[in-house]
A protein has these predicted regions:
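Active-site-adjacent C-terminal substructures of enzyme catalytic domains
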Residues: 162-293, 308-309, 325-326
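Histidine-rich, glycine-flanked metal-binding segment
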Residues: 1-7
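Divalent metal-dependent hydrolysis catalytic cores, especially in the metallo-beta-lactamase
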Residues: 16-24, 34-63, 79-92, 121-133, ...
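Divalent metal-binding pocket/active-site signature
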Residues: 86, 93-190
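Short, well-structured alpha-helical segments that form the helix of a local strand-helix-strand
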Residues: 291-302
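C-terminal cap of metal-dependent C-N hydrolases
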Residues: 304, 308-331
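Residue-level marker for buried hydrophobic side chains located in beta-strands
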Residues: 9-11, 152, 173, 231-232
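Metal-dependent catalytic neighborhoods of phosphoester/phosphodiester hydrolases
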Residues: 58-69, 97
Length: 331
C-alpha cells in the first residue's frame, strides 16, 4: 500500500549538473542552469546545492555569478536552491585523492581566496569541501564557519589526527566518504576509517549502487548510525541522459545502461547519473533502514547540516509516495 509522504521531496547537497548541463563548464549559461534545475525538481528532489568543483578562479567566478543571476531571474527556482557547495579548490592534488578534479587548479587553503569565492556567490556559499591534511586547513575551516558556511572534509589523504583537528576547528561533515581517495590505502591510517571514527562529523555518501557496494553501505549504517548519515548523488551532467558517451567534468565518460558513469582510460567514476529518488531506493533495498531512517538520511539530516528549517522547503510538482515492497516513487 502506497503512503504519501509529508516531505516535499529529497534534499541533495551535491549536484554537479543534470541533463547535459555541467555547472563547472565554461559553456554554462543562465538558461542552461534554469533548465537543468527545473528538470531535476521534477524527479523527486525538492531542494539542492549546485556544486562547483575545483577550477581556476576565473571560471569559478564566472559560473557562480551566472547561477546567481539565473536565480534572480527565476524566483520560484530560487526557493529550491539552498546555496552553493564548493567541492574545492582547497583539496588534495595527489593521485587518488584528487579524483576527476583538475590537479593544476588546486589551491592551498586560503581565507583570502575563500572570501572572493563567497563574494562571487552573493553570500550564498553554504558548504565547502577541503582536504583536512592541507597546511592551513584548520584556519580556513574556522574562518568559513565564522562566515556561516559548513565545512566538510574530502578529496584528501587525511589520517585520524588531521580529521580530528578539522572537527575541532568547526568542520561538521565528510564529503562522499569512501570515494575521492586512493583505491589502496594503509589498513589503519586512512581517510575512510578516520572519518567514520570522528563522531562530530556527518557522513555524506553516494548510495547510487556504483560508488559504494552494498556491504560498505551497511557498514556505514552501523558504524556511523542514521543520525550521522546524509545521502547525496554527486550527480554529473550526464545524469538524466540515456546511456552513451559524454564529456563529464572535463573527462571522456561512458554512461552504461545500468547507470554507471566512468572514465575507461583513468578507470575511475566521474560522478553519478542518479537522482536522490534512485539513491533512496538503493538504501531502502538494503533492508536495514526504517522509513523514518530514510527520511532523516535524505531530507532532515542534510538540512540540519546547512542550518535550514525543513518548513522552508517548498512543494514540488510531484509529491513522493512510499510502499514497503516498492520503495519511493513520484506521485
Amino acid at each position: 500500500m502506497k503512503t504519501a509522504l509529508k516531505i516535499p521531496g529529497f534534499v541533495d547537497l551535491q549536484v554537479n549538473g543534470f541533463v547535459g548541463v555541467d555547472f563547472s563548464s565554461e559553456a554554462l549559461t543562465e538558461e542552461g542552469f534554469i533548465h537543468a534545475a527545473r528538470t531535476l525538481l521534477e524527479r523527486g528532489t525538492a531542494a539542492f546545492l549546485p556544486t562547483l568543483i575545483t577550477n581556476h578562479e576565473a571560471l569559478l567566478r564566472r559560473n557562480l555569478m551566472i547561477i546567481v543571476r539565473a536565480l534572480k531571474k527565476d524566483a520560484m527556482l530560487d526557493r529550491h536552491i539552498l546555496g552553493f557547495h564548493l567541492e574545492g579548490p582547497f583539496i588534495s592534488a595527489e593521485p587518488g585523492a584528487v579524483g576527476a578534479h583538475n590537479p593544476a587548479a588546486v589551491l592551498a587553503p586560503s581565507c583570502e581566496a575563500f572570501d572572493k569565492l563567497r563574494e562571487w556567490s552573493d553570500g550564498k556559499l553554504r558548504l565547502l569541501t577541503i582536504a583536512a591534511e592541507a597546511p592551513g586547513a584548520d584556519q580556513l575551516a574556522r574562518h568559513a564557519v565564522a562566515c556561516g558556511v559548513a565545512v566538510s572534509c574530502g578529496h584528501h589523504l587525511a589520517g585520524p589526527d588531521d580529521v580530528a583537528r578539522l572537527a575541532e576547528a568547526g568542520a561538521t561533515a565528510l564529503t562522499h566518504l569512501g570515494n575521492g581517495m586512493p583505491n589502496q590505502v594503509h589498513r589503519h591510517n586512512n581517510p575512510l576509517l578516520a572519518g567514520l571514527a570522528e563522531e562530530r562529523l556527518k557522513v555524506l555518501f553516494i548510495p547510487d549502487g556504483h560508488h559504494l557496494p552494498r556491504h560498505v553501505l551497511k557498514v556505514f549504517a552501523r558504524a556511523a548510525g542514521v543520525e550521522r548519515l546524509i545521502a547525496t548523488t554527486d550527480a554529473a551532467s550526464a545524469a538524466g541522459l540515456p546511456p552513451g558517451r559524454y564529456d563529464v567534468l572535463g573527462n571522456h565518460a561512458v554512461l552504461d545502461p545500468d547507470g554507471r558513469l566512468h572514465n575507461p582510460e583513468k578507470q575511475c567514476l566521474v560522478g553519478s547519473s542518479a537522482t536522490m529518488l534512485e539513491c533512496m531506493n538503493v538504501l531502502h533495498a538494503l533492508g536495514c533502514f526504517s522509513l523514518d531512517d530514510l527520511l532523516r538520511t535524505g531530507f532532515y539530516n542534510p538540512l540540519q547540516l546547512i542550518g535550514t528549517d525543513p518548513a522552508e522547503i517548498p512543494s514540488c510538482k510531484h509529491g513522493i509516495t512510499f510502499a514497503p515492497d516498492a520503495g519511493f516513487a513520484l506521485s
